[in-house]
Amino acid sequence: MRIKSTREQRILTFKTTVRWILYYLVVFCCFIIMTSGTLLKPILLVPVALCISINNNMYASVFTGAVCGFLIDISCGKLFGYNAVILAFFCIAVSLMYELYLRQRFMNFMLINAAVSYIQCRLDYKFYYQIWEYEDVDRIFVHVSMKVWIYTIISGVFIYLIIKLINKPLMPKTHLTIEEVIKTSDRS
């Protein structure tokens, strides 16, 4: 993106600030939803962290993944930092995959959301239930973990749309279109 004037720089700074404020407002709302209700609710912060990672660089992605992971730990009563490490790793991986290989398509997000959510639910089950060899521990995976996984995937659709709605007017253009290049060259 070519920025010519200080006015354009101020507009870019303003849009970026508003975009990040809205991102973290969504994160806070999802945290509130996760802390209320019953045991069977989606882990909303996983799709939020992944959606934010799709559109940003590695550093913003790892920070957002860590913050969302800490909030998951707080809302679920897990070991502090457990989900932060998992989400920080996956947010870096998702950011790099979208930067290097994938296009920003809905199906790509849904597949990645399903995979990351499953891995997170599986690790949660493995380290909090199966490792202690409780009786009938497989029932917890089938009746609790898998339902939470499905709810998380379904909620990913709505979160993707919300983040897309935020990004549409506020995300800076990374490339100039042919028309913009022609208009720029005509002015010179």
Predicted features along the sequence, with ranges:
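Terminal, non-globular segments
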Residues: 1-188
